[in-house]
Every structure is written in structure tokens, then in C-alpha cells.
Amino acid sequence: MTERTLILIKPDGVTNGHVGEIIARIERKGLKLAALDLRVADRETAEKHYEEHADKPFFGELVEFITSAPLIAGIVEGERAIDAWRQLAGGTDPVAKATPGTIRGDFALTVGENVVHGSDSPESAEREISIWFPNL
């Protein structure tokens, strides 16, 4: 089934020079880049994006990190795009859960700075795409 999903290459992925390799992995997987935007996220967008974590102690740090430097926001399309992207990304904890060969397994060291984000369901994808790309 063809799907769309939001991807973020977080500030650590941009700052550490991993954008080209991440995009290459997306394309090698057979997924299509439908939108791509380099930007510094504003606080309002970051807070909306992470609203399910608003009551957690790490919320402030999460918002600070995601707004601290440029990131890439994108929409990826393809057959089972959500699962395909999550497979490419690897587990959220890059040491305990992400295997070598995944983006996080290869490039991340901490849960807080784990290089990429991807929607975890069709509902999340729809909500997140509307936050980052309200005109699409």
C-alpha cells in the first residue's frame, strides 16, 4: 500500500554531515522524496510536533534540541513507507535497540540525539505532515 510519512533529519544529523547518506539510503530503499525542506524549526512547530511528550520531564530539552540548528523536514512516499522508513532509521535508542546498518545504529550515540525521526502510524504521519507542511 502506498503511504506518505514525515521524516526529520534532526539537527545532529545535519550538523554532522549525514544528510547525503540518509537521502541516498531513502532512495536505495525505493522510496520517493515528495518534499524536502532545510529549516530551523520554530518553537511553536516543535511543541506541536512533540505535544504527546508535553508532560514529560525531557520535553523542554527535546524542544530546545530540535530548534537549536537547521534540520531537514521531508515527506517520503512509497509502498509501506512508514514501516520502510522505520526499518531504515532503526530503534530509537541507538545503542540498545538500533542495529548496525540502520541510520541510528551507524550515526547516533544517544536517545536524545538520534539523528532522525519518522512517523509511527498513518494517523501520526497525517498529523505530523500537516504540522511541518501545512500547504501540502
Curated annotation (Swiss-Prot):
SMART domains named among the record's database cross-references: NDK
Record carries keyword Nucleotide-binding: yes
GO cellular component, one term: cytoplasm
An example molecular function term from Gene Ontology annotations: ATP binding
Cofactor: Mg(2+)
Localisation per UniProt entry: Cytoplasm
Cited Gene3D superfamilies: Nucleoside diphosphate kinase-like domain
PROSITE patterns per record: NDPK, NDPK_LIKE
Cross-referenced InterPro entries: NDK-like_dom, NDK-like_dom_sf, Nucleoside_diP_kinase, Nucleoside_diP_kinase_AS
Subunit relationships: Homotetramer.
Function text: Major role in the synthesis of nucleoside triphosphates other than ATP. The ATP gamma phosphate is transferred to the NDP beta phosphate via a ping-pong mechanism, using a phosphorylated active-site intermediate.
PANTHER family: NUCLEOSIDE DIPHOSPHATE KINASE
Record's protein name: Nucleoside diphosphate kinase
Organism: Corynebacterium glutamicum (strain ATCC 13032 / DSM 20300 / JCM 1318 / BCRC 11384 / CCUG 27702 / LMG 3730 / NBRC 12168 / NCIMB 10025 / NRRL B-2784 / 534)
